[in-house]
């Protein structure tokens, strides 16, 4: 304090000396001299005040943008997302703004803007003192108020938002002072803008930042929103409508107030006549024309591939944070792998098939409620449970915390709701919340993805049947893959030296496994989807094609469940896997995207390439700031991959193959090899199909939003009936399009000398009709495998020992077999 006191005393003396000197200026002077001194003093004080505001003297006025920030000023811009074929498929934005250059705008707009908003624009340097004096005079004389802000001042206000984004300091807390500080800062910024930018640049920046209402920021978005044209295509009358809105975007909005907008448009046109930018004859003609709009407000959810775009946003979130970008304001150009034409084919295929699936589902259940448990009993409180997870229920609970009757009343009170309909899209009905939930949960859902195995590029992505109604993306939803998981069982078998022509017996067997939930050993036995075992030794190629569960589980034990899980992870499965014997039948949840990536590893000769959604990103200045790397890794031997390619093709060629119906869609394209694998989880809750060719891998899933909602029979609910046709319709369109001729190719001959045709070219297996014989079946069960809690075999029992725990005769499905008929081979 002792050091500060002398400084304060010195400052006090200097201030007193200044005021003494200033008073002496007036003494003995003429009145006009005193007047001049007063005026000069005010001018000096004004500029000293502006300087103090600019430098935030003693933190009294708050921070202001510096010269560098003004010179390199940037605005919030929408990021654009492009397809691989160069089509703009959507935007990410908070304010829908896409900048344009001065030359990209019709000159009529510039003329209308200057003539109306700032007629002395080319004469002032940011502040129009003539206009300011006129505005003061009008205010004093109570005339109609005129705007005193120049275009440059408006730009300063729009771009830097002094009223919201910057503090007004300690003095800003005083009543009436805050607005003075804000206006002062806008004047200072306007002057700096004139010093750092040309008039043309200022006009362009203004046109790109100004708000035209309807979430249209900037001239490009406004022209698209109101007239569905580019700024270059604007006519004089259209330009006048947009300029007229700048005075008050709501009051003069052509949608909200068409009469006001028309009157304001004609005022703008008359201003153009007054300044010689429009002839009287042109005005007389144009002013009689009604405003013709092609109005369409653009949202984040316009365009195509909505689920894909959400996935891209999720993927880029971390990249944006790490690289100091904002996806919704940084004006990035994002180039993706999706092909707009293939996406269109995929969406059409999904809707075409799902309409039929929904018809089958509705006919199948009739008036019954489909949310049933495994014993076919309606699940009590199912709809109520869904309702309690809805925002409306949480709102009602907060409003009526101790009044459940009121909550129930409002949940069951009819009101207008928006629902999905296949024929009409979004429909509006008078319905209660509970009834709308009942209506919507009856829908079956789907997902689809197409991927290039060599690049990992995702070419088509369908997350569900309608984004507006169901925003949850089923491509990344976790569901049981069923028999599609057998790919990894057989791949590991190939890794360990087996071949497609090696045989395993289709027979009943059981095993003791440790059930962690019950904390004890239980007996588990796999069953085939057709309900019986042939007892035949079947080539692995046929067992895979027919999706025989007993062989898959036996192989799982031979190869080791842990090894199979490791192989699955190497090939592209990222989700955790429960290493139990049932894993061989697809008991652990995974998603369609990672499954397609793993199947791509087989198509790519054993080389794993992580799926790619974004190829490159360019910033607002045209600089490339991201390029997707191509990381390829050989994760399974080429020999295993080649043999699995043959196995997959067996699914479409072997007698009884579950994927044979794919030939009905792609059979005419004989220059292309296709393999496939179907899958159906327990109770037909999840139906899958994966299709593989050398250059393209496709996958589809079909099921209910909740696992308890499903078909009751494999004849309707299996993967070959529900999911496969989506891929089939898609492939018909793609392979028939000359633009995608590159996808029409064959796998070719083996590249390794140690691969012989005898390994995969074996005689087709034809399932013979088998007599029902307990003795014969018992012969096939020669041993029982007992596993510890980690799934490892610990002991083996003979057939005689087995009877102590329960003979095959006691197993309900051990001997049952139907007569020859169409059956589902891909159920768990």
Language-model features: where?
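N-terminal type II signal-anchor transmembrane helix
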Residues: 2-82, 120, 357
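Peptidoglycan glycan-strand catalytic modules in the bacterial/periplasmic cell-wall system
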Residues: 75-285, 301, 307, 466, ...
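Short active-site loop at a secondary-structure junction
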Residues: 98-103, 437-446, 469-488, 501-504, ...
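Active-site SXXK
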Residues: 112-114, 272, 346, 455-456, ...
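Non-catalytic structural connector segments
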Residues: 144, 279-337, 341-402
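A penicillin-recognizing enzyme superfamily signal
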Residues: 336, 340-356, 387-452, 457, ...
